[in-house]
Curated annotation (Swiss-Prot):
Keywords: ATP-binding, Glycerol metabolism, Kinase, Nucleotide-binding, Transferase. GO terms for molecular function: ATP binding; glycerol kinase activity. ATP binds at residues 11-13, 264, 307, 311, 411. It comes from Bradyrhizobium sp. (strain ORS 278). PANTHER family: GLYCEROL KINASE, SUGAR KINASE. This is Glycerol kinase.
């Protein structure tokens, strides 16, 4: 058994990939599923859609690879983080749609907690800030708004889990209720210093401990699938949240290594080693991975809108038919125009953390057209990455002693235009790897490590291969002018916040 099956459950689709022992890809399957937007700022998924699409893609990938369950050494799971599911322990029936990480409905709960002065203590325990992004307030909302849910939870009848936990519970036929440290660290309920669920936080958010899963290493024995799913049992041996899995897939095992993933949003992680680094620039302190009971930490910056801004160009404005058209269109833009898009469609993430502001375009003229809008959209992702980059360099103690090279992955990195502009604005090299499926690869590696298919991290890192290095080519004067314009645009958006 030299094959590993990776489940990559994302915000808009579920994917399954079969990896060989040399980390080459044997098969890929993908299935999209709908998102639901019942109110402004609300984003939901049907848990059954998540489950069904996951099982179907796994079966499809196995069929494409010509493999059976007996050929698979282990399954690794990576998932959209923070997305929250609450279900009945006895029936497996979800009591509410999954509340997605992008969802902002708990902004008022968060504002109240902040006003009561809880954020410093919460941040010290979790490494996070109080924000609707994280799972804790989503759980509280479900318990308070679904009739009878709180009473059922207090009687021990309901379970909570992030998507990995929910899938594991279903895959194992309800026998295993567990997660890993990376996903637990995104809930606002987990103490990243003790590695335990925190009773003070549970009391603050009124979440019964009986709802919570067991927390394990990222590479561990998570049980086996029921035989009926794939024609035989397969052990589940690795779990990590999508951004941590990408960090592993990018082989960022050394402190000071940084990766940025461009999907629906953009997420940058900087490995800080065995010591959690407290940010002075509104970054998050999180767990990068946990192996053999040892936690490795990271600084993280989260941008809510990246690839979804390109989807807006396609679906909202209709100026492109396919995402791949965006770069060539942007290349035709008028260089004399300075158009800035601040894509705060669901608020702003790091380092601003304002859930109330909304997006805006600046610098429009009568001559502004589709090319300029495409240019501004792609550039907005680069500017937001610059904000994270600058904050990480300020927070990381060794930044002055070493140049951080950024490793990138995700759908948007296929755009040479965007990656070159990113290198220009960062004034630093940007490395795109040969294997772009780094998130799935990270999940596969964790499972394969436990199953004996893959070697220890240091040796695994030797397999990382560079596809292209983008080097900065923009003049310092142009760079500073463009960054100053971006700063003014963000300031304008933040000034529009009336605190309502």
């Amino acid at each position: 058994m030299s094959f590993v099956l990776a489940i990559d459950q994302g915000t808009t689709s579920s994917r399954a990939m079969v990896f060989r022992s040399d980390i080459s890809i044997a098969a890929v399957a993908q299935q999209e599923f709908p998102q639901h937007f019942p109110a402004s700022g609300w984003v939901e998924h049907e848990p059954e859609d998540i489950w069904t699409s996951t099982v179907m893609t796994c079966r499809d990938a196995l069929e494409k690879a010509g493999l059976a369950a007996k050929d698979i050494a282990a399954i690794g799971i990576t998932n959209q983080r923070e997305t929250t599911v609450v279900w009945d322990r006895a029936t497996g029936q979800a009591v509410h749609r999954a509340i997605v990480w992008q969802d902002r409905r708990t902004a008022d709960i968060c504002a109240k907690l902040k006003a009561e002065g809880h954020e410093p203590d919460v941040s010290a325990r979790t490494g996070l800030i109080i924000d609707p992004y994280f799972s804790g307030t989503k759980v509280a909302w479900i318990l308070d708004h679904v009739p009878g849910a709180r009473e059922r939870a207090e009687r021990g009848e309901l379970l909570f889990g992030t998507v990995d936990c929910y899938l594991l519970w279903r895959l194992t036929g309800g026998r295993v209720h567990a997660t890993d440290a990376t996903n637990a660290s995104r809930t606002l309920l987990f103490n990243i210093h003790t590695g335990q669920w925190d009773d003070t936080l549970l009391k603050l958010l009124r979440v019964p401990r009986s709802m919570l899963p067991e927390v394990k290493d990222s590479s561990a024995d998570f049980g086996t699938t029921t035989p009926d799913l794939f024609g035989g049992p397969i052990k589940v041996a690795g779990i990590a949240g999508d951004q941590q899995a990408a960090t592993i897939g990018q082989a960022c095992f050394t402190p000071g290594m940084m990766k940025s993933t461009y999907g629906t949003g953009c997420f940058a992680l900087l490995n800080t080693g065995a010591t959690p680094v407290k940010s002075n620039n509104k970054l998050l302190t999180t767990i990068a991975y946990q192996l053999n009971g040892i936690r490795t930490y990271a600084l993280e910056g989260s941008i809510f809108v990246a690839g979804s801004a390109v989807q807006w160009l396609r679906d909202g404005l209709g100026i492109i038919k396919h995402a791949a058209e965006t770069g060539p269109l942007a290349d035709k833009s008028d260089s004399m125009q300075s158009v800035y898009l601040v894509p705060a469609f669901v608020g702003l993430g790091a380092p601003y953390w304002n859930p109330r502001v909304r997006g805006a375009l600046f610098g429009l003229t009568r001559n502004t057209g589709p090319a300029e809008l495409a240019h501004a959209t792609l550039e907005s992702v680069c500017y937001q990455t610059y904000d994270l980059w600058a904050a990480m360099r300020a927070d990381w103690p060794d930044a002055s002693a070493a140049t951080i090279v950024l490793r990138v992955d995700g759908g948007m990195t296929a755009s040479d235009w965007t990656m070159q502009r990113l290198a220009d604005l960062l004034d630093a090299p940007v490395d795109r790897p040969m294997i772009q499926e780094t998130t799935a690869l990270g999940a596969a590696y964790l499972a394969g490590l436990n199953a004996g298919v893959y070697p220890e991290p240091e040796k695994f890192a030797d397999n990382w291969r560079l596809e292209h290095r983008f080097r900065p080519a923009m003049s310092a004067a142009t760079r500073q002018r463009k960054l100053a314009g971006w700063a003014r645009a963000v300031k304008g958006v933040l000034a529009s916040d009336e605190g309502e």
